[in-house]
């Protein structure tokens, strides 16, 4: 019997994990090992993928992968070491006891002035970035779905100028399964930080400790931060910190990163282990009596076999040994074993497999989880079921229910657009626009009264105020949209959207995980492109990158809002929703084309953790809104200001630098006139529109600024509603801004970036041409 056949609510014991390669290793690292107990929680609304519970946390996988996992059903779900009724262990005694958890014998003090470098390592969605912000005072983006951090970020620990801590992407093990996991592993192995801060989710401790064990094998000074201890204790759970420290051989500090509790103690221990280079006291977790000691003998034999090669390659010997046994190709390549040594390694491993009754990868994973189980039996009292889990299950009955998930998603998105463009955002935009107009009128009167030179007067009023001011008025709309997206992300809902939409996305050649970068793309294409690093398949990653620009970013909102308010008043929500849906539809058509041409093959397996729902943090939401508002203002007073001044200059002077009374005689008209024949079939045969669209390549917001400068507020009289509709469609689909193209170049290379820009311009031209043609027929 396979996991695919197990009924919802039923439990079973895993007997064998099929498949091969990185995916199988990832399943093992996530706890899907022979002997583990697994329970089917539910199926996605479309029947695939499925959600299962293993080692106390929720994991999603497709039915095709579940069909490769052989199981043996059990009558009743076990409750091993859950809700044990015994006296509560004493709380962690005091904060930062001087040297209590440190081994003086292992000290090797670094010279004064040495920069203490730290790697902040942990599972996805365990609170790493929140802790990083507390340690450094930084304001990195925080979310409640796996894969928020996709690149490493560094900062100095507050109060300790000779330190540098690097926030690495979340990983489940040191086996490279995706590009962000490779980033994390390479940093630890190659950059060789002075110490590791391993952050562990105390509410999901079994899975998190799997990575901890691999980090300990590396022999690097380390401190373990047990995060979310407030949630564990609040649910009547506890951890014997001192006993856990004794069994792991490193300092263990209970913290709540979100509340900044225990962070000072964590810093003191981290400084100590790095300054005095105290290695972990324990690296050997295999029991010589476990299953006849087969794994124990294998690991120690391989350690002796590869010891000299590991030292030459700069690899921790114990870590290299377990990875060599697992068959990690990157580690084996670095070890550079000769033919005889390779044969000896293979003989040792095969003998272990025969004695243990498991293949090499499963045997190593089982050894780690066996130690974790013993550790938790002795040190952890877990609540039967947390309030957060109970709450999540109740919410999921509606938001991921078979008949309610899709309607809920559509309803939520419609509500977001309605409130953004018709209610909250529109009201705030009107207020800000009135304020800018009043300030512009006051400035105009002041400059006139002072007798300022007409050229300067025109620059300030017709250039800066008309251009930059028109863009600034759309700030409330952008902030409002980001507010709602932040709520969805911070609550954990976006991860559910990926679960719900996986089967649908698979029909166009993508995985459900691709929904996360594409949803981020509605905010900004640049972080959306970076977020594709969480995808483990190069095929899926490239395909998703090429599709994210079709998700209309907030930088285009000023264009939509401007034309909708001028040409289609009272229909803002409808027009906006139509534009967003059109972008999604064109993206789907492009995906179907890519699927059968550039990216043949199957999408990656869908393996993802579903976090508990959490109440959005007011601090996190406010911080994100401030960052987005600040970024918008910086662009408005840098790129857009410069573009506005340049456009004003070029449309105000001719080639001889004489000021012109008619902008049709200006330098700008001459340059943009070259493009007029290209845009004429779209109903956009005006050099001023061509200029505005060109300026949009620098920043999409500058399209409105340029139009305001060139048309001088008379655009409604000079353009027809049909031309406005054509322009809206072209603006929706043509090449993203230069920052987005640069991010594509960074991820895929220059040829892909140029190709994407030209391809989107072609699609935009065709779509606008069709729009204009249909309009003429109506």
Predicted regions and their residues:
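Canonical P-loop GTPase G-domain recognition
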Residues: 232-285
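Conserved C-terminal guanine-recognition region of P-loop GTPase G domains, centered on the G4
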Residues: 160, 185-252, 559
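Extended, low-charge hydrophobic alpha-helical regions
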Residues: 355, 362-366, 382, 423-464, ...
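Hydrophobic core segments of alpha-helical transmembrane domains in multi-pass membrane transport
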Residues: 408-419, 481-486, 564-566, 579-593, ...
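Transmembrane helix-loop junctions at the membrane interface of multipass transporters and ion channels
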Residues: 550, 554-577, 739-749, 770-778
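Juxtamembrane inter-helical linkers in multi-pass membrane proteins
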Residues: 434, 438-442, 495-525, 600-624, ...
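Extended helical scaffolds that flank P-loop GTPase cores
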Residues: 249, 276, 282-452, 659-668
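Conserved G1/Walker A P-loop phosphate-binding module
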Residues: 91-173
């Amino acid at each position: 019997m396979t996991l695919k056949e197990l009924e919802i609510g039923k439990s079973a014991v895993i007997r064998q994990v099929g498949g091969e390669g990185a995916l199988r290793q990832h399943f093992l690292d996530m706890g899907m090992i022979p002997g583990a107990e697994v329970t089917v929680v539910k199926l996605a609304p479309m029947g695939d993928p499925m959600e299962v519970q293993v080692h106390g946390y929720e994991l999603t996988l497709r039915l095709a992968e579940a069909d490769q996992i052989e199981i043996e059903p059990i009558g009743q779900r076990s409750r091993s070491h859950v809700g044990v009724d015994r006296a509560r262990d004493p709380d962690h005694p005091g904060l930062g006891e001087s040297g209590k958890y440190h081994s003086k014998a292992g000290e090797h003090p670094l010279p004064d002035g040495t920069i203490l470098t730290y790697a902040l390592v942990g599972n996805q969605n365990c609170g790493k970035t929140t802790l990083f912000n507390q340690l450094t005072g930084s304001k990195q983006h925080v979310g409640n779905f796996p894969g928020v951090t996709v690149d490493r970020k560094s900062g100095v620990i507050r109060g300790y100028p000779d330190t540098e801590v690097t926030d690495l992407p979340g990983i489940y093990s040191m086996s490279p399964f995706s590009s962000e996991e490779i980033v994390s592993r390479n940093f630890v192995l190659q950059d060789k930080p002075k110490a590791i801060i391993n952050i562990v989710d105390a509410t999901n401790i079994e899975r998190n400790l799997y990575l901890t064990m691999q980090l300990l094998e590396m022999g690097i000074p380390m401190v373990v931060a047990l995060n979310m201890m407030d949630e564990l204790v609040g649910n009547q759970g506890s951890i014997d910190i001192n006993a856990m420290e004794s069994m792991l051989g490193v300092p263990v500090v209970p913290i709540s990163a979100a509340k900044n509790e225990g962070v000072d103690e964590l810093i003191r221990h981290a400084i100590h282990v790095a300054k005095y280079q105290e290695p972990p006291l324990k690296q050997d977790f295999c029991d010589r009596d476990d299953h006849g000691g087969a794994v124990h003998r294998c690991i120690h034999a391989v350690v002796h076999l590869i010891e000299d090669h590991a030292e030459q390659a700069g690899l921790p010997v114990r870590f290299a040994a377990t990875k060599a046994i697992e068959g990690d190709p990157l580690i084996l390549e670095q070890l550079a074993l000769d033919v005889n040594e390779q044969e000896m390694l293979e003989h040792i491993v095969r003998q272990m497999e025969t004695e243990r009754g498991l293949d090499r990868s499963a045997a190593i994973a089982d050894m780690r989880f066996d130690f974790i189980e013993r550790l938790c039996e002795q040190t952890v009292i877990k609540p039967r079921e947390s309030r957060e889990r109970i709450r999540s299950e109740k919410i999921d009955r509606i938001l991921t229910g078979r008949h309610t998930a899709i309607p809920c998603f559509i309803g939520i998105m419609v509500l977001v657009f309605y409130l953004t463009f018709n209610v909250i955002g529109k009201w705030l935009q009107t207020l800000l626009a009135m304020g800018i107009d009043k300030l512009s009128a006051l400035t105009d009167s002041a400059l006139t009264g002072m007798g300022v030179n007409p050229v300067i007067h025109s620059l300030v009023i017709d250039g800066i105020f008309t251009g930059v001011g028109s863009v600034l008025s759309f700030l409330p709309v952008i902030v409002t949209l980001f507010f709602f997206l932040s709520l969805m992300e911070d609550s954990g809902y976006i991860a559910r959207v990926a679960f719900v939409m996986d089967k649908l996305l698979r029909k166009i050649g993508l995985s459900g995980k691709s929904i996360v970068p594409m949803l981020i793309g509605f905010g900004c294409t640049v972080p959306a492109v970076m977020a594709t690093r969480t995808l483990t398949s190069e095929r899926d990653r490239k395909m998703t990158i090429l599709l994210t620009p079709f998700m209309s970013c907030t930088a285009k909102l000023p264009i939509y809002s401007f034309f909708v308010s001028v040409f289609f008043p009272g229909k803002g929500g409808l027009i906006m929703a139509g534009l967003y849906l059109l972008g999604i539809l064109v993206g789907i058509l492009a995906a179907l084309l890519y699927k059968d041409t550039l990216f043949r093959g199957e999408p990656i397996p869908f393996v993802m953790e579903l976090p508990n729902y959490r109440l959005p943090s007011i601090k996190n939401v406010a911080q994100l809104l401030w960052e987005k508002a600040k970024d918008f203002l910086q662009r408005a007073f840098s790129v857009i200001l410069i573009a506005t001044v340049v456009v004003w200059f070029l449309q105000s002077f001719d080639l001889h630098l004489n000021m012109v009374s008619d902008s049709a005689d200006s330098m700008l008209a001459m340059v943009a006139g070259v493009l007029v024949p290209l845009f004429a079939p779209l109903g956009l045969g005006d050099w001023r529109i061509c200029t505005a669209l060109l300026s949009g390549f620098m920043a999409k917001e500058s399209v409105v600024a340029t139009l305001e400068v060139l048309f001088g507020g008379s655009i409604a009289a000079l353009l027809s509603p049909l031309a406005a509709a054509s322009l809206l469609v072209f603006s929706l689909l043509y090449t993203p801004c230069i920052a987005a193209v640069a991010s594509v170049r960074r991820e895929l290379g220059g040829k892909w970036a140029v190709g994407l820009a030209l391809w989107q311009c072609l699609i935009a031209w065709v779509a606008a041409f069709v729009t204009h043609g249909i309009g003429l027929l109506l």
